[in-house]
Amino acid sequence: MTDLTSLTIAEAREKLKAKDFSALELTDAYLSAIDAANGALNAYVALTPEKARDMAKASDERIASGSAGELEGVPLGVKDLFATRDVHTQACSHVLDGFKPKYESTVTQNLWDQGAVMLGKLNMDEFAMGSSNESSWYGPVINPWRANGSEQKLVPGGSSGGSAAAVAAHLCAGATATDTGGSIRQPAAFTGTVGIKPTYGRCSRFGIVAYASSLDQAGPIARDVRDAAILLKTMASVDAKDTTSVDLPVPDYEKAIGQSLKGLKIGIPREYRVDGMPEEIEKLWAKGVEWLRDAGAEVVDISLPHTKYALPAYYIVAPAEASSNLARYDGVRYGLRVDGKDIADMYEKSRAAGFGKEVQRRIMVGTYVLSAGYYDAYYLKAQKVRTLIKRDFENVFHEGVDAILAPITPSSAFAVGDEELASDPVKMYLQDVFTITVNMAGLPGLSVPAGLDGKGLPLGLQLIGKPFEEETLFKTAHAIEQAAGKFTPAKWW
């Protein structure tokens, strides 16, 4: 019999309907795979085997009665940023020790309503702040990929590193993730998986622990483009509990898979050719252009002139919002409490002990740029830059461009504990150089695997689309996937 965990969501869905195996058998196969691998990969921080089996049994009953949902019996992993009722939800931070919410995030509720099964909570950078999944209170996630002939441990990217690693290693059929500055797309590129950050407002943010509220957006990480389309259809919804949720019908994204690219105009932004870009990334980008031309698309050069200001502007706006959002964690009602001589001392000690170094750094930067003497010089200026970045994209789309093809990462996955990156936060922040403009402009962005580098590690390409035109990204990404093939790591764990 086929290894059940090797099936895509689309394949598992059909075989479950045909009763080739039960949802319980599929769930047990994933739980066994997690037991065997999680010690080596550290992708999950909390497992829910009893809940998973109960959900799978209920799925089998619905399949038998002919009332199956769209994701009936499909086992998923959930990033630890999503509130899951009565289940560990800590944003992988010490400050939220023991927190189990009494409510469910809208995105996960949508998935359970369609029959999906929860396997557990996935590791991530603390409060989603990081590009390597090394800032988690639970330790780093290890990328299931290794360089040819090497045993060196590599990062899976961040902040959704647990989601990407679990999907790549077949420890779940798909996973929820979030993207504030590249946290879906960069880990997907590092692990040979597909990740989409939808348009801001497409998925509800209710029940997702906030990092930077004007940038955060939920999306799926999956094994292929079709699976990502299937997941996004269920994750997306209008939600009165999120004031930024957009009241637009959710298309059947899966129908976009396989559609022709004839008549589609793809833009190539010259500003993404940065100094020191590895030749392999440059070559892959050129190959992507050829694949899209071969598929019938027209490819044109475009300019996004304010791209070079995006990184500094992002690292003002995001920490500013984070410093405000994270002010609520004080040890009073839930999470870690460190006693002090008075309430102010208790606040200070709880926050100092509860937040990790990177989170503290961003809170301090955010507090600084919002302070009286610096608000106009930094925060206000960064918001003006953000408007200009958004306008760049609007101008390009107004000229008839349907989607943009760009690199997603400046390199393939790097080593866990890389000393150069660990000693210089700005070098780590540069990992986001190709991804943050999408968040600043609120646009949809998709990462699709496009090849392997000389070391045998996956590289991805990024597609950027018009607001709420995710279907264009799915059909374009599918054309790249057809040309490039799919990539699975050799099992060493």
Swiss-Prot record:
GO biological process: translation
Gene: gatA
Catalytic residues (positions): K79 (charge relay system), S159 (charge relay system), S183 (acyl-ester intermediate)
Pfam families, per the entry: Amidase (PF01425)
GO molecular function, one term: ATP binding
Matches recorded under PROSITE patterns: AMIDASES
CC terms in the record's Gene Ontology section: glutamyl-tRNA(Gln) amidotransferase complex
Gene3D superfamilies noted in UniProt: Amidase signature (AS) domain (3.90.1300.10)
UniProt keyword list: ATP-binding, Ligase, Nucleotide-binding, Protein biosynthesis
Reactions mediated catalytically: L-glutamyl-tRNA(Gln) + L-glutamine + ATP + H2O = L-glutaminyl-tRNA(Gln) + L-glutamate + ADP + phosphate + H(+)
Job of this protein: Allows the formation of correctly charged Gln-tRNA(Gln) through the transamidation of misacylated Glu-tRNA(Gln) in organisms which lack glutaminyl-tRNA synthetase. The reaction takes place in the presence of glutamine and ATP through an activated gamma-phospho-Glu-tRNA(Gln).
EC number: 6.3.5.7
Statement: the UniProt record of this protein carries the keyword DNA-binding: no
Similarity comment: family membership: Belongs to the amidase family. GatA subfamily.
Entry protein name: Glutamyl-tRNA(Gln) amidotransferase subunit A
Assembly: Heterotrimer of A, B and C subunits.
Organism: Agrobacterium fabrum (strain C58 / ATCC 33970) (Agrobacterium tumefaciens (strain C58))
Key word Thylakoid present: no
